[in-house]
């Protein structure tokens, strides 16, 4: 299977996001990389499901709460930017203050 660097990046994000999802399900608090991966993977999947950029910008702020991440993590993630593939092309999705 030949994957482009971009496809490899998306696969890595998805895998890390899946790991974070499993840890959340076990009641563990996510660290910085896990939180970023969890939100990023959800945004990529949301774009694939047909959500708009504006919808994803809102959804991205509702995925994790302070209680679900380790202390200090919300302050370490002022924003998340990810290029997602939409039906009409690739667009940059920016989520400000993703963990409120």
Curated annotation (Swiss-Prot):
One of its GO terms (molecular function) is urease activity. Keywords: Cytoplasm, Hydrolase. One of its GO terms (biological process) is urea catabolic process. Its main location: cytoplasm. The keyword Hydrolase applies. Its EC number is 3.5.1.5. GO terms for cellular component: cytoplasm. Pathway: Nitrogen metabolism; urea degradation; CO(2) and NH(3) from urea (urease route): step 1/1. It catalyses: urea + 2 H2O + H(+) = hydrogencarbonate + 2 NH4(+). It comes from the Bacteria. InterPro entries: Urease_gamma, Urease_gamma/gamma-beta_su, Urease_gamma_sf, Urease_subunit. It is found in: Cytoplasm. The keyword Cell cycle does not apply. Belongs to the urease gamma subunit family. Heterotrimer of UreA (gamma), UreB (beta) and UreC (alpha) subunits. Three heterotrimers associate to form the active enzyme. PANTHER family: UREASE. This is Urease subunit gamma. It comes from Azotobacter vinelandii (strain DJ / ATCC BAA-1303). The gene is ureA.
